[in-house]
């Protein structure tokens, strides 16, 4: 199992609007291809940031799922709606430690 921690920094003052839009439009699409572990809003550090953690079986699974997602016509239509909100995006891949309950 691998986890992708994907952080979106959004335009100041637009975080609530971004989350509402993502929940209504983006989440139903991407959830077909990845399992959402959780979504958080940063309260310290780099503000105006939302962190999603997605689970995949392994890197090959993530790669294949993202390839299919990138061809999904609903996702393709959604991307231009999301981009104006974004200032920065970062993805970090993590594997669970041997004692982690999330394996």
Map each language-model feature to its residues:
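Short amphipathic alpha-helical segments
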Residues: 14-38
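Short amphipathic alpha-helices within nucleic acid-binding modules
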Residues: 16-20, 58-71
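Short, structured motif recognition centered on aromatic/hydrophobic residues
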Residues: 2-6, 18, 30, 49-54
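Surface-exposed interaction/gating patches
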Residues: 1-17, 98-103
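Residues within well-ordered alpha-helical secondary structure of globular protein domains
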Residues: 21-24, 68, 81-84
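Glycine-rich beta-strand-turn "strand-cap" elements at beta-sheet edges
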Residues: 11, 32-51, 57, 74-103
């Amino acid at each position: 199992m691998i986890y992708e921690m994907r952080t979106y920094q959004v335009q100041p003052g637009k975080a609530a609007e971004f989350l509402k839009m993502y929940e209504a439009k983006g989440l139903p699409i991407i959830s077909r291809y990845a399992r959402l572990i959780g979504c958080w809003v940063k309260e310290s550090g780099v503000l105006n940031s939302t962190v999603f953690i997605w689970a995949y079986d392994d890197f090959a699974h993530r790669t294949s799922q993202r390839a299919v997602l990138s061809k999904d016509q609903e996702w393709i239509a959604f991307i231009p709606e999301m981009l104006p909100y974004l200032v920065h995006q970062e993805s970090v891949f993590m594997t669970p430690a041997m004692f982690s309950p999330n394996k």
